[in-house]
């Protein structure tokens, strides 16, 4: 009898097909997030669970899932899962690193360029008919933005995604500063990057890009005090997690001109609505689409399947998050 896996959202077909050879697969087919009460019912009979970053997988879920042995998170981050509780119960947790690195780094640079050069504002100007209404083909003072080539970028968090952003910055001949919990001297040499204390990085950078995981230490890492350290011409880009930035402080900074602009792909609450923020024209907003390329999302689905199949065969999953769990329970559904 095949073990049962429940997938909380429809993922690319390539991953589902891989799983169907080894598992009894059920997929929540609604576009909307699965209601909590339904999730708690569905997990009662499953051996494996594939989750999205928008679902809270905590003690309550585990208590309702007596057969659950592995949670495969369809994301690189896993702050939506109570890792300590999972480990205590002998439940393996996996994620999907690497396969979405380039797509997320691309989006960081897309936001950086779009914000610096008023791409979205220009698009609205054309679509609204305002350009035609003005009756002027070109004006030397319209949509003046900030140069990117040769400027200074400060990357907070130099993991896989942070390094990929730095490689793109190198192509723009940018001075690369970074702040991380630990210095990475080999990466410094490879990318000609400079390690800086956080406050110095904020003072010196023309563009500040956040690429850190959400932890107790990084919650509201960018607050009012630190926003005031940035240049008035600086632009903040967040492709990390929304709660790394104090949104109220950021709105104040954008309204009062402490910084020039922001590009945000992540928010403190998602889906997100903030009337004050949405009124501002010096911010570019996207709905958490960092990994939203065909290649990245299919790669994530394949990695989810590979993790579950490896576990079923008694092997350690390739991207196991909580390695301590191996001491508590061997991989496999037996």
From Swiss-Prot:
Homodimer. This is Glyoxylate reductase. PANTHER family: 2-HYDROXYACID DEHYDROGENASE-RELATED (PTHR10996), GLYOXYLATE_HYDROXYPYRUVATE REDUCTASE B (PTHR10996:SF283). HAMAP family: GyaR. NADP(+) binds at residues 158-161, 180-182, 239-241, 288-290. Keywords: Cytoplasm, NAD, Oxidoreductase. The keyword Oxidoreductase applies. One of its GO terms (molecular function) is hydroxypyruvate reductase [NAD(P)H] activity. It comes from Pyrococcus horikoshii (strain ATCC 700860 / DSM 12428 / JCM 9974 / NBRC 100139 / OT-3). Its EC number is 1.1.1.26. The active site is at residues 241, 270, 288. InterPro entries: D-isomer_2-hydroxyacid_DH (IPR050223), D-isomer_2_OHA_DH_cat_dom (IPR006139), D-isomer_DH_CS (IPR029753), D-isomer_DH_CS1 (IPR029752), D-isomer_DH_NAD-bd (IPR006140), Glyoxylate_reductase_GyaR (IPR023519), NAD(P)-bd_dom_sf (IPR036291). GO terms for cellular component: cytosol. It is found in: Cytoplasm. Pfam families: 2-Hacid_dh (PF00389), 2-Hacid_dh_C (PF02826). Belongs to the D-isomer specific 2-hydroxyacid dehydrogenase family. GyaR subfamily. Its main location: cytoplasm. It catalyses: glycolate + NAD(+) = glyoxylate + NADH + H(+).
